[in-house]
């Protein structure tokens, strides 16, 4: 996260970090939506995913931090056919559920979509500088705004007209999610509204906001899968 500050240790109990058995570094974020399920971006899929819950500082782990592996993964499209612009969402079922604790608690799915102008909080262990990467020990948080989708279409002309995507950032630049924040949550007015998935090569530039999968549009799909209907189809 560019232009943010260290998150309050108590404000991100639902934030998880993804790493692989090979590389110890957190490469993506994710969001705990109940005791057994994590939502992230499809492009965060890897062979040997490890999921860290209840983390704040990597160097000094919380005593209630937990590690899990996924038992099942679900994609809107087969994991490799989502496009750069569309349906970048993955639901992972934990092999063992986690209990709520001081630093672990799920966030609920949104009951309404966010409106343009909403103030939202983006968070993650991604780089805090853009051209050279600097990975922080603790997650950083920044407040950004939901912008009109047309702002993103102006910045990225190849964006499709249909929108299951939120456009969010600061028009004048300076605050943004960045490399390593993908898959993590965008929280607007206390509701989990977006999954970070794409931004310009240099983060936090003026008029180049980030793109976030619009969680609200996928709530039926998510709830169907969680309730056992694994053939549920994604919104078109």
Curated annotation (Swiss-Prot):
Annotated glycosylation sites: 99-100
UniProt entry keywords in alphabetical sequence: Disulfide bond, Glycoprotein, Hemostasis impairing toxin, Hydrolase, Protease, Secreted, Serine protease, Toxin
Alphabetical list of SUPFAM superfamilies matching this protein: Trypsin-like serine proteases
GO cellular component: extracellular region; secretory granule
Gene3D superfamilies named among the record's database cross-references: Trypsin-like serine proteases
Disulphides: 28-44, 120-188, 152-167, 178-203
Compartments, as annotated in UniProt: Secreted
Entry keyword annotation includes Hydrolase: yes
EC number of this enzyme: 3.4.21.-
Membrane-spanning residues: none
UniProt enzyme class: hydrolase
SMART domains: Tryp_SPc (SM00020)
Keyword Glycoprotein found: yes
Every Peptidase S1 domain range: 1-227
CDD domains found in the cross-reference section: Tryp_SPc
Principal localisation: secreted
GO BP annotation list: proteolysis
Alphabetized GO MF terms: serine-type endopeptidase activity; toxin activity
PANTHER family found in the cross-reference section: KALLIKREIN-1, KALLIKREIN-RELATED
Function: Snake venom serine protease that may act in the hemostasis system of the prey.
Assembly notes: Monomer.
Family the UniProt entry places it in: Belongs to the peptidase S1 family. Snake venom subfamily.
Protein's name in the database: Snake venom serine protease ussurin
Source organism per UniProt: Gloydius ussuriensis
